Amino acid sequence: MNNNIINLIAAIILSLSIIFGWQYFVVKPEQKKQQQQIAVQKAENLKKQQLKALVEPATGIVVQEESQVQRIKIESESLTGSISLKGLRFDDLILKKYKQDLSKNSSEVRLFSPANTENAYFAEVGLVSNLSSVKLPNNDTIWNSDSEILSPEKPVHLFWVNEDGVKFLVTITVDENYLFTIEQTIVNNSDKELPVQSYGLINRKYIAVEKAVNILHQGPIGCIDENLKEYSYDDIKDKKSEKFAASKVDWIGITDKYWLSSLIPDKSSNYSSNFNYALKQGIERYQVDFISPVQIIKPGKNFSIKSRIFAGAKKVDLLDKYEKQYDIKLFDRAIDFGWFYIITKPVFYAMNFFYGYVGNFGVSILIVTVIIKLLMFTLANKSYRSMKKMKNLQPEIDRIKNLYSDDKARLNQEIMALYKKEKVNPVAGCLPILVQIPVFFSIYKVLYVTIEMRQAPFYGWIKDLSAPDPTTIFNLFGLLPFAPPSFLMIGAWPILMAITMFLQQKMSPEPADPMQAQVMKFMPLIFLFMFSSFPVGLLIYWSWNNILSIIQQYYINKFN
């Protein structure tokens, strides 16, 4: 095994340790809180009281039987569910295109659930006022609707009139995907000025996040003042609340690995926003919310404001589309592409492009790997020549080391002089490695976080490229009727990866150091166990990359 492969192994192990260790153990540094003026602070305190009252039913203090709640049915190509006419709450939403798992009878993914259910999760937008005498729609308000069904072809119009004759109108539309648009209009038919603030909130009962997903962000997220704000559930639990005073809020929400619920406020003003945690009656809840400045509506005047709610799958092209169409900054960053974002997203685009032609993401991975190999061929050729020269110079280097073993400065001078004389660059062999590491992690991220790869099949027994190989040699790949423990789930693709790695070693010159050569012989076996639990799509990439490297090495050996 040559020094290039040794460097690759060491670099990958080191990079894995740094990336996983950093994301798992290091708590993100607290962001500095902005100084708030006295008026803003008063508004924040008022908002906290108002929004607390708005979500109080979600804590279980007020519970209404679901059968008694009037609802508007949601029906589109992507969604089914309903909106509660009591309080105008989005609390019943199912993603029709996605199943919980690959089993035949698997149910569809449910995103939103009513406040009094086990997995309560809902969104709402509305109005509050800093005057208690102003009667506004609230959680107990029963709205009147002109339709019982909301669909992309048929918006819903709702209205409610208070005791002073002030009319509140709401128009809700939904597109073919996951975006709701809510336009609120207030018609002030009273003889008094009407101070109002628009708000939006998403409230969720906490569901434990598995440690295995600490390599990606889950929890409150948003784009505030054109900066991405990410806080884990633990971050917000420790802080209780993270506040952002009057800011430009492009969007805020709560994200899962594949699903996102987010509020997209009107761009007409700045908003105060919060990421909150609360524990009531033993129930942990998280909430993200925003509220606008006070808007004074004079008698006889109207006021309208538009907000949007995204609730659905984090499809890359869909988030890109909304980001461009509605100027929603950093909306695609709801997908955690990680540190190598500038590489990971183009890698996804390439895979998705070829998927459009071949209809299989596994085949798309193979094609992208070939392209990467072709782009790196010249670099790999130069690297191999450099390593061959280094191999030939090893006896002379050993002689110099013995000669100047007591004089390190002279030793380094003589070795560098030898490199210069023979026109050898000692780091040339590392260049392909530096390219392969970000590509490796980018493909891993694409497989792990994109909804497009979720339950995407390859061929044969591979039904989900984002999951580990489901077979294992320890039950003869399913022939024996028992399931080994997870650490013994050594499937066919991990074995193929180890075999191709071993063959690649055989194609390469052994290290000059006998001890190092012995250690390297065990690396395929170590990697076999180390990567057996990784997404099988990554093992397909690595196995195919090894095969291409063997072919490339054969070509270079023959013609050089």
From Swiss-Prot:
InterPro entries, A to Z: Membr_insert_YidC, Membr_insert_YidC_N, YidC/ALB3/OXA1/COX18, YidC/Oxa/ALB_C, YidC_ALB_C, YidC_periplasmic_sf
Record field: transmembrane: 5-25, 334-354, 357-377, 431-451, 476-496, 522-542
Alphabetized UniProt keyword annotations: Cell inner membrane, Cell membrane, Chaperone, Membrane, Protein transport, Transmembrane, Transmembrane helix, Transport
Keyword Transmembrane: yes
GO molecular function: membrane insertase activity
Membrane topology: Multi-pass membrane protein
Predominant cellular place of this UniProt entry's protein: membrane
Cross-referenced PANTHER family: CYTOCHROME C OXIDASE ASSEMBLY PROTEIN COX18, MITOCHONDRIAL, OXA1
Protein name: Membrane protein insertase YidC
Organism listed in the record: Rickettsia rickettsii (strain Iowa)
